[in-house]
């Protein structure tokens, strides 16, 4: 019988909404979910490790990856490139494991064009005031960049209608529980299983 493929789960939302925190907590709960490491040209933040948090690239290196079509998606956000290496994503799905992409809204919409069967989840902040507080709390951004991120966030929230699900990140554990419920339900969808069970009937 054909092995069930994994799901491509795309999680995105405004900067500061807590995508990274939710993804880390989700992986602790579900060992079948692999985390897709993105490539970026932004400078590493304190504690970030190349190849673990991101693949840190120069602009020249990143543009070479674009030219060779080695990225599932890519976008330029607040002056830096972000993108998803395609080979790792395909290999993970084919192995039967789910893979989660934590990416910006622009990138998520590009992935939707190429992988319409993916599961697209928009992570919402409880409020814009809370979102600003989280960004300020990082202590890594200037006031100018914070204001720019907030303006972009308002535009991104308008794009949530293009997603399959919206999850509010009021508390990390609650957000994780909601996403786990979504993933479980998606694995039970008829269209994902029909070929597998057609083969079962044919064998018998």
UniProtKB/Swiss-Prot annotation:
Domain Guanylate kinase-like: 6-184
Enzyme class: transferase
Broad class of the protein's primary localization: cytoplasm
Binding site for ATP: 13-20
Residues passing through the membrane, by range: none
Catalyzed chemical reaction(s): GMP + ATP = GDP + ADP
Any GO MF annotation of the entry: guanylate kinase activity
EC number in record: 2.7.4.8
Cell compartments where the protein resides: Cytoplasm
Keywords per UniProt: ATP-binding, Cytoplasm, Kinase, Nucleotide-binding, Transferase
GO cellular component: cytosol
PANTHER family, per database record: GUANYLATE KINASE, GUANYLATE KINASE-RELATED
Family label: Belongs to the guanylate kinase family.
Summary of the function given for this chain in its UniProt record: Essential for recycling GMP and indirectly, cGMP.
Name listed for the protein in its UniProt record: Guanylate kinase
Organism of origin: Halalkalibacterium halodurans (strain ATCC BAA-125 / DSM 18197 / FERM 7344 / JCM 9153 / C-125) (Bacillus halodurans)
Gene for this chain: gmk
């Amino acid at each position: 019988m054909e092995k069930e493929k994994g799901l491509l789960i795309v999680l995105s939302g405004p900067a500061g909404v807590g995508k990274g925190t939710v993804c880390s907590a989700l992986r602790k709960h579900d060992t079948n979910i692999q985390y897709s490491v993105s490539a970026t040209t932004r400078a590493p933040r304190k504690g970030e490790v190349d190849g673990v948090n991101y693949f840190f690239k120069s602009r020249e290196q990143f543009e070479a990856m674009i030219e060779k079509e080695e990225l599932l998606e890519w976008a330029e956000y607040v002056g830096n490139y972000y993108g998803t290496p395609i080979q790792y994503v395909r290999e993970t799905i084919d192995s039967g494991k789910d893979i989660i992409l934590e990416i910006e809204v622009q990138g998520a919409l590009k992935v939707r064009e190429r992988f319409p069967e993916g599961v697209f989840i928009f992570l919402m902040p409880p409020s814009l005031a809370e979102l600003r507080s989280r960004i300020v709390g990082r202590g890594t951004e200037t006031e100018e960049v914070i204001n720019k991120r907030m303006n972009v966030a308002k535009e991104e929230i308008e794009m949530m209608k293009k997603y399959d699900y919206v999850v509010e990140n009021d508390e990390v554990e609650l957000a994780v529980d909601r996403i786990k419920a979504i993933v479980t339900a998606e694995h039970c969808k008829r269209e994902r299983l029909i070929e597998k069970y057609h083969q079962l009937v044919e064998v018998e």
